[in-house]
Amino acid sequence: MATLGTPRIGPRRELKTALESYWSGKSDESALLEAAAGLRAANWARQKSLGVTVIPSNDFTFYDHVLDTSVMVGAIPDIYGWKSGPVPLATYFAMARGAQGGNDDAACAHGHQGDGHAHGAPAQEMTKWFDTNYHYMVPEFTSGQRFQLSSLKAIDEYREAKALGYQTRPVLLGPVTYLKLGKSKDANLDPLSLLPDLLPVYIDVLKRLAAEGAEWVQIDEPCLVLDLDDATRKVLRAAYEQLADALPKLKVMLTTYFGGLGDNLDAALSLPVTGLHIDLARAPDQLEAVAAKAPHDLILSLGVIDGRNIWRANLPALLDRLEPVVSERGADRVQIAPSCSLLHVPIDVSLETDLDAELKSWLAFSVQKMGELATLGEALAKGRASVADALKASADAAAARKASPKVHDAKVEGRIAAVTSDMARRKSAFAERAKLQRERFGLPPFPTTTIGSFPQTAEVRKARSAHAKGTLSDTDYEKFLQEETARTIRWQEDIGLDVLVHGEFERNDMVQYFGEQLSGFAFTRHGWVQSYGSRCVRPPVLFGDVSRPRPMTVGWWKYAQSLTAKPMKGMLTGPVTILNWSFVRDDVPRSLACRQIALAIRDEVSDLEQAGATMIQIDEAALREGLPLRRSEWKTYLDWAVECFRLCASGVADATQIHTHMCYSEFNDIIDAIASMDADVISIETSRSKMELLDAFKTYKYPNEIGPGVYDIHSPRVPAVDEMTGLLKLARERLSDRQIWINPDCGLKTRKWEEVRPALVNMVEAAKLMR
């Protein structure tokens, strides 16, 4: 029974506390190192006590394991001032957060991190780890790149575990995946061409681990589940042959996860390694092909426990699949494991004392998943009778969940069956709608607006916390929120914004706010998962059929619109984003769960329109994040994702204007899907890329209206008027004046008022100059 990695944050987010104390200067480096050592020791002890027999080391990180790899191999850009020798913690955190004033460089309202460019050295770019909600720091390579061993972390942590009595299997990110995750600063440099210079550092690390007594090493090459060309497969083969030649006695467990090997199976099986790990949660169908083709002396690690979702496994059903493989290959040739590292799930469901008892009995967090592994291992080694009670409990939980009325709602199933294609189409084409909307609103050219949220100040957070604790009454809390909203609306009018928002002070999180008001969702108290560094998220649990018992935003919209004669946007989170940022039920297709959410949001859109809303924004911040890893699967996903957006947005009159917002750095390759969403206005993040995102529109004639962001909200810097007009002139080269709206990149929730005020004043001034 092996684990590939465990959550780093601690059951009570102890890592977050220690990091933020260190960053703010309240504690020193030794206190941070001591806290980290305590978390590692607790992790190893927990795994041992739960019956895990193959325990990893070097799976802990202060910020991100890809950044740890960059530091290990000395891939540190010159801007951070490091030349050689061990990399100081200050340099490490400068790469992670930017130097001098990294605290200012917040995530946006949708949790996407800034790039620290405000002042000092910028942070490295950050992006999603494959198709998960974890983020990694993107390695940067230049021509003439040199690598050198500059961190002994992997060796130190192996030694640390050994001193505590644990024989561990150290984890390294594989050299080929590491290079593929990186970015070259030189357009002509293929990162894979750097492999001959990189491998000697890996060999040095592996030799040091072997000298310390490591018999096994886990090397992660998740790139093997991607679309690879023959050249990459060749590079993989060359890399592992070189490692095997240098260390013939070291046993390597090559791990793949987040998908099936597919057409890379032969390439993976040809590598000179001792073991191969496959993901059987994401790609259960690959078991037969791998088992049939794998050489008999290859140890197979079968990732049967889902490392990315929180549902309890049906252990007897898993044993039905595992037993034939074990009897065919022999128990010593099979390991069982989670599908991937457990960093993607919370730590311990037993901490959830407020959760519905029936729902709780269906869940397994990291601790429970290790317990499931131990049960499977025992059953395979000694027979099912040895763990009969645990197997019965598992089967009973699966049966109870399947039959529970909490999961199934006949009304929702009836509505889904009644959905027609007309429900996902606006009444008229955009050209006709646009004419009606222009007549209705009479907006000037280059209309100005914001994305939705305004700064959530310390006072707002304090009031929310007091209300949650019961020390601030419902009446007083509502009065406070009304005052904040009214003040924000007055200020928007004063500076001359054309289309207003209410500021979203009543909302804690753009997904949680809606999930808490929809049936079929539940929320944990301690279900934290690392997003990056000290930032943790608590995804909602989507456990059953979704419906909307009552209006969710109409009351606040009506109050806000009553304070102004200008258009006030209704603000909603879209179904695809709610789905992609939740732990999703695994008993129905994701597309069906999304369609249910879309119908609930459609009801809200309809109620907002009936209440008088003339503009309704439906944010799809995470539409792109749901793209499958293999391009051949993109179309299926985009078809249902776009259909779900249209289903929630298309029940309105032609004169009602539907807005959507997307924040990410790349959509040229899905421009057709974005156009087919048919939103009247789409706002996007473009300021940091200097409008490069709009290159897609040079050849693609996008018909609808678009708000390219002119103010980078990830940075505290206030952009000047001429900077914004410069960006708008670039936009004008690709779009007609009539199409362009003017707005920031994203919501303003994480910024300070003293930054937002001058920036938006400048934005309005830029609009006037463009007119």
Curated annotation (Swiss-Prot):
Per the UniProt entry, the signal peptide is: none
- Binding-site residues, 5-methyltetrahydropteroyltri-L-glutamate: R13, E14, L15, K16, K128, R535, C536, W581, E625
Cofactor: binding details: Binds 1 zinc ion per subunit.
The record's active-site residues are H714
Give the domain of life: Bacteria
Q: What is its EC number?
A: 2.1.1.14
Q: Which CDD domains match?
A: CIMS_C_terminal_like, CIMS_N_terminal_like
Pathway, according to UniProt? Amino-acid biosynthesis; L-methionine biosynthesis via de novo pathway; L-methionine from L-homocysteine (MetE route): step 1/1
- Name the positions where L-homocysteine binds: I451, G452, S453, E504, D619
Q: Which SUPFAM superfamilies match?
A: UROD/MetE-like (SSF51726)
Alphabetically sorted, this entry's keywords are:
Amino-acid biosynthesis, Metal-binding, Methionine biosynthesis, Methyltransferase, Repeat, Transferase, Zinc
Q: Which reaction does it catalyse?
A: 5-methyltetrahydropteroyltri-L-glutamate + L-homocysteine = tetrahydropteroyltri-L-glutamate + L-methionine
Example GO molecular function term? 5-methyltetrahydropteroyltriglutamate-homocysteine S-methyltransferase activity
Task: Enumerate the transmembrane spans.
Answer: none
Q: Name one GO biological process term.
A: methionine biosynthetic process
Pfam families given in the database record? Meth_synt_1, Meth_synt_2
Query: According to its UniProt record, which cofactors does this protein need?
Result: Zn(2+)
The answer to keyword Transferase applying to this record is: yes
Q: Function of this protein?
A: Catalyzes the transfer of a methyl group from 5-methyltetrahydrofolate to homocysteine resulting in methionine formation.
Entry similarity comment: Belongs to the vitamin-B12 independent methionine synthase family.
Q: What is this protein called?
A: 5-methyltetrahydropteroyltriglutamate--homocysteine methyltransferase
Could you tell me which species this protein originates from?
A: Nitrobacter winogradskyi (strain ATCC 25391 / DSM 10237 / CIP 104748 / NCIMB 11846 / Nb-255)
Gene that encodes it: metE
